[in-house]
From Swiss-Prot:
Protein name stated in the entry: Tubulin alpha-3 chain
Cellular component terms (Gene Ontology): cytoplasm; microtubule; nucleus; spindle; tubulin complex
Protein family membership: Belongs to the tubulin family.
Broad class of enzyme this protein falls into: hydrolase
Organism: Saccharomyces cerevisiae (strain ATCC 204508 / S288c)
Major localization class: cytoplasm
Length: 445
């Protein structure tokens, strides 16, 4: 067995977690109360597959290997009373009494510290139920207080306690349209600095990019958080499908790092997904393998706003789902390689890693997304993602030059030096990306 424990931290993390588990349950044929759908003798995905994410109790019920943590009760109370209340064990849902007030320092140093022991104890219990735990999957936002502060504290502690286990993150990057607080740049820079050495691979999801996709591809004039989370869940499901169903690539978490991370700090792959279609448009589109493969290289299908044509690719994984044959994939990849827009770094072979999972993508009934026969999720490590760091660093600098809002952080026991230290670390990260994108032969002169 190769189990994965999902840890959802903060409001964004928990709400994305809800969307994911609703989709996972549907994909594996598990009902809202944790029992199998009628007519199934065991969950879809084969014994090895579903048990990475679900634990079977003695009563034939399937329980997600997941923990929800938030510093205030509202979001987790919604899980306790919502449609999936019987799916989760009450011990999996942990909340505090007062929130982090969008303050990294409250989540990391004061309020978060009070709850962290309880969370780790629950994680320990869950790890004991596993035969061969392979690692952790985090979902949290970088801009909120709990997601950034408590999220990074947990990652730090887990890396000491479970050093060899993989730690993958799905991190929500703040966006101007959906900004919930003015201090998001501070929280993002501080949490990235703290987690940089502890996370093995971080898939960033930029709210602005998702917002635009919902408007453009799905025709939603004013996308809500539940629309955004539904789309994010679809992407996370595609990334994890190879862990949950029989597939040939990325069958365990370590493989993500091996295939995508050339240097420990350069661990922020860009995620693209296609096709993203509304139910109205789906009947008019063919979605051949080459069409969806090409779509992954278009900025409109990326989960982070950046321009890959200005960057260079270091590694590429294409994860297909559904009705796909290898010959079509090879032909599609050849077409892509012949395009002048796709530039690889010169020190890395132009290899594309291909994974095919024959289980077609599912869509929850209330979703705006159309049901399709095949889909592809591309994970690419590209130097273009440094744009995202540049954007947030500039916003950080504007505020920090005036020391705006800093007293709220210092008041929670944080030292001001941590701001400059974190900012310097991110400046170094930007430089790292410039260096890996430089041609290797240029250094000889």
């Amino acid at each position: 067995m190769r189990e994965v424990i999902s840890i959802n931290v903060g409001q964004a993390g928990c709400q994305i977690g809800n969307a994911c588990w609703e989709l996972y349950s549907l994909e594996h044929g598990i009902k809202e109360d944790g029992h199998l759908e009628d007519g199934l003798s065991k969950p879809k995905g084969g014994e090895e597959g579903f048990s990475t994410f679900f634990h079977e109790t003695g009563y034939g019920k399937f329980v997600p290997r997941a923990i929800y943590v938030d510093l205030e009760p509202n979001v987790i109370d919604e899980v306790r009373t919502g449609r999936f209340k019987e799916l989760f064990h009450p011990e999996q849902l942990i909340n505090g009494k007062e929130d982090a007030a969008n303050n990294y320092a409250r989540g990391h140093y004061t309020v978060g510290r009070e709850i962290v022991d309880e969370v780790e104890e629950r994680i320990r219990k869950m790890a004991d139920q596993c035969d061969g735990l392979q690692g952790f999957l985090f979902t949290h936002s970088l801009g909120g207080g709990t997601g950034s502060g408590l999220g990074s504290l947990l990652l730090e502690n887990l890396s000491y306690e479970y050093g060899k286990k993989s730690k993958l993150e799905f991190a929500v990057y703040p966006a101007p349209q959906l900004s919930t607080s003015v201090v998001e740049p501070y929280n993002t820079v501080l949490t990235t600095h703290t987690t940089l050495e502890h996370a093995d691979c971080t898939f960033m999801v930029d709210n602005e990019a998702i917002y635009d996709i919902c408007k453009r591809n799905l025709g939603i004039s004013r996308p809500s958080f539940s629309n955004l989370n539904g789309l994010i869940a679809q992407v996370i499901s595609s990334v994890t499908a190879s862990l949950r169903f029989d597939g040939s690539l990325n069958v365990d978490l370590n493989e993500f790092q091996t295939n995508l991370v050339p240097y420990p700090r350069i661990h922020f792959p860009l995620v693209s997904y296609a096709p993203i279609l509304s139910k109205k448009r789906a009947t008019h589109e063919s979605n051949s393998v080459s069409e969806i493969t090409n779509a992954c290289f278009e900025p409109g299908n990326q989960m982070v706003k950046c321009d890959p044509t200005k960057g260079k690719y270091m590694a590429n994984c294409l994860l297909y789902r559904g009705d796909v044959v290898t010959r079509d994939v090879q032909r599609a990849v050849e077409q892509v390689k012949n395009k002048k827009t796709v530039q690889m770094v010169d020190w890395c072979p132009t290899g594309f890693k291909i994974g095919i999972c024959y289980e077609p993508p599912s869509v929850i009934p209330s979703s705006e997304l159309a049901n399709v026969d095949r889909a592809v999720c591309m994970l690419s490590n590209t130097t273009a993602i440094a744009d995202a760091w540049k954007r947030i660093d500039q916003k950080f600098d504007l505020m920090y030059a005036k020391r705006a809002f800093v007293h709220w952080y210092v008041g929670e026991g944080m030292e001001e030096g941590e701001f400059t230290e974190a900012r310097e670390d991110l400046a170094a990260l930007e430089r790292d990306y410039i260096e890996v994108g430089a041609d290797s032969y240029a250094e000889e002169f």
